[in-house]
Design a protein with these regions (language model features):
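Short glycine/serine/threonine-rich phosphate/pyrophosphate-binding segments
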Residues: 14-24, 46-47, 91-95, 115-123, ...
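Glycine-rich oxoanion-binding loops at beta->alpha junctions
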Residues: 49-107, 116, 155, 169
Length: 411
């Protein structure tokens, strides 16, 4: 009798993470899986035996299509850090997970997520090998941060980049209507890698002069020099629009947002909660230059804008889910699917497999050779990299003028 599969979603959601879920589900069913279970709220929910049978939820082609076009995590998410299984306390957690997976007759385990989720897959695969388990553990990449190693880019990034490029164009239009001195600072997600903030450069084109300054976390930040640059820019044009990463840091390693408020909150993986960078900088500029300012935080909007997804991104998100299932059924375990770019024009991409050890707890940064000399703008090399990822659209299915989503009441 065919073994069952189980799939979970973890970490921050994206606009296309459910397309990867659809890819895993359909690929498993095509390959003869018994039931396909979903973890409700990831591994944390699984430890509480909170699961659903996806076969009972995704009954029609329309259900699958709705799933692909529904943003955020259909199964719910978590930020649970698995302990070290080499300790007595930690091993008890793995023993419980093994017991639950055994009860469900699981042969294939998929986790859709970013760096921390790949850490989870790596630990489970290692423990599985230790106890002689025949379960195949596979990682499916997802993160708007685009900071996963070995993959050319990560599903979720293309749609977030598209959203950022679009809203930056619209913010620039709004910021220039009065002809008076004004500084608009837009805060964009990105703790240690500036891929999302770099996407603000996509706004530039024949119909838009683009943002005036980009501040990446890869470049040490100096508040005084920042204010001086703004002052120089305002001598040339009254309205300035700046894109700044939430994670810009001073030379001593402190986050800029810490200059305004102590950042005490951390998640299970030890990541500080970052917010307030744009607000601090806007207040500083207003005080020192006696000019009007506005701060805008894109916040969760950049990761859940299902009305503005990239068709390329959705297609590839589905593709990596299917590739993970294919690999698991072929006997692979402890690996992640990566996207390998073949060419830019025409844009072509394929998939490959990499050991989790090459991915987990590592970060891919924006290459500084793609940034101009004074670190305030992106060069054509970045545009050539990013533009193919935002191409084409896949609009939501609208009902009475609003996007129609599929959802699980259990989550």
């Amino acid at each position: 009798m065919a073994k069952n599969a189980i799939v979970g979603q973890s970490g921050g959601p994206t606009s296309v993470i459910n397309a990867s879920l659809a890819g895993v589900y359909e690929s498993c069913k095509r390959r003869g899986a018994g039931k396909v279970y979903g973890m409700l709220h990831g591994v944390a929910g699984l430890l509480e035996r909170r699961t659903c049978v996806l076969d009972d939820k995704l009954k029609t082609a329309l259900d699958i299509e709705l799933l692909k076009r529904t943003p955020s995590s259909y199964l719910g998410s978590c930020r649970y850090k698995l302990p070290d299984w080499h300790t007595a306390e930690g091993e008890a957690v793995y023993q419980k997970l093994s017991e639950i997976l055994g009860e469900l007759d699981i042969g294939y385990f998929f986790y859709i997520g970013g760096n921390d989720s790949m850490d989870t897959i790596g630990k489970l695969a290692d423990y599985g090998a230790h106890i002689g388990s025949d379960i195949r553990f596979m990682g499916v990449p997802k993160t708007i941060d685009n900071d996963l190693m070995v993959t050319d880019h990560t599903p979720g990034y293309g749609s977030a980049a598209k959203y950022i490029g679009v809203v930056m164009k619209e913010i620039i239009r709004d910021a220039t209507v009065y002809g008076t001195k004004y500084v608009t600072i837009v805060e964009i997600m990105g703790r240690n890698a500036g891929w999302l903030t770099a996407a603000a450069s996509l706004a530039r084109g024949e119909d838009c002069e683009g943002v005036d300054m980009i501040c990446l976390p890869e470049v040490p930040f100096n508040v005084d020099r920042f204010v001086e640059k703004v002052e120089r820019m305002q001598k040339e044009k009254p309205s300035i629009v700046i894109a700044v990463s939430e994670g810009v840091k001073l030379a001593d390693g402190r986050y800029v947002c810490e200059l305004a408020d102590d950042v005490h909150a951390v998640d299970a993986f030890g990541h500080k909660a970052l917010t307030g960078t744009a607000r601090f900088l806007a207040n500083t500029v207003a005080r020192r230059l006696d000019t009007k300012t506005r701060c805008i935080e894109l916040s969760t909007l950049q990761r859940c804008a299902g009305h503005l997804t990239s068709r390329t991104d959705i297609t590839e998100a589905y593709q990596v889910g299917g590739a993970a299932a294919k690999a698991a059924f072929e006997g692979h375990t402890g690996e992640m699917v990566a996207l390998d770019r073949i060419s830019n024009a025409p844009y072509q991409c394929t998939t490959s497999l990499h050991p989790i050890s090459e991915v987990a707890n590592l970060e891919k940064k924006v290459p500084l050779e793609w940034v101009n000399a004074d670190h305030t703008a992106m060069l054509p090399e970045f545009l050539a990299y990013a533009m193919p990822l935002i191409q084409a659209e896949l609009t939501p299915i609208y009902v009475e003028g609003l996007p129609h989503h599929i959802y699980l009441p259990e989550t």
